[in-house]
A protein has these predicted regions:
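A short Gly-Trp-Pro
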Residues: 7-9, 14-15, 19-148
Length: 148
């Protein structure tokens, strides 16, 4: 995965998810905290440096806080200085969805959980090798689920 791949996927290239989690908005509202619902379903953004997850680098996996799909591994996590947890790549093809985002007068690539469509954050082309990508994620959209 590189920036050209992320743009192609955001423009509609095929990116099949491993499965789907289809719930009503009422079910999501009941399952998520108010902050999670605001970020994950309404595409909000948590404040930078609001979570200790930014400085958590213990081995393990990070999953979608909505559906539990494993999205990132701590091996690809890095300190970006942005105030949000940042990763260089997802754990597998198809787990992250990519969408063009022109909100707030900007052109960005939104990252979503490809299983439940939860807003995770954005992807930028300024990350470390080998991908050169920075997956800048909202911590409330993730949960640490397993230690290596």
């Amino acid at each position: 995965m590189n920036w050209a791949d992320a743009i192609a996927l955001a423009k509609g290239a095929e990116n099949p998810p491993p499965r789907r989690d289809e719930r009503s908005e009422a079910e999501w509202r009941a399952a998520l905290s108010p902050e999670q619902y605001q970020v994950m379903r309404l595409k909000g953004t948590e404040r930078p440096f609001a979570s200790e997850m930014c400085s958590l680098f213990k081995p393990g996996q990070y999953a979608c806080a909505g559906c539990g799909t494993e999205l990132f591994d701590s091996a690809s996590k890095f300190e970006s200085g942005t105030g949000w947890p940042s990763f260089g790549e997802p754990v597998a093809d198809g787990v992250v969805g990519y969408h063009l985002d022109t909100s707030h007068g900007m052109q960005r690539v939104e990252a979503t959980c490809n299983v439940c469509d939860a807003h995770l954050g954005h992807v930028f082309p300024d990350g470390p090798a080998p991908s050169g990508l920075r997956y800048c994620m909202n911590a409330v959209s993730l949960e640490k689920v397993a230690d290596a």
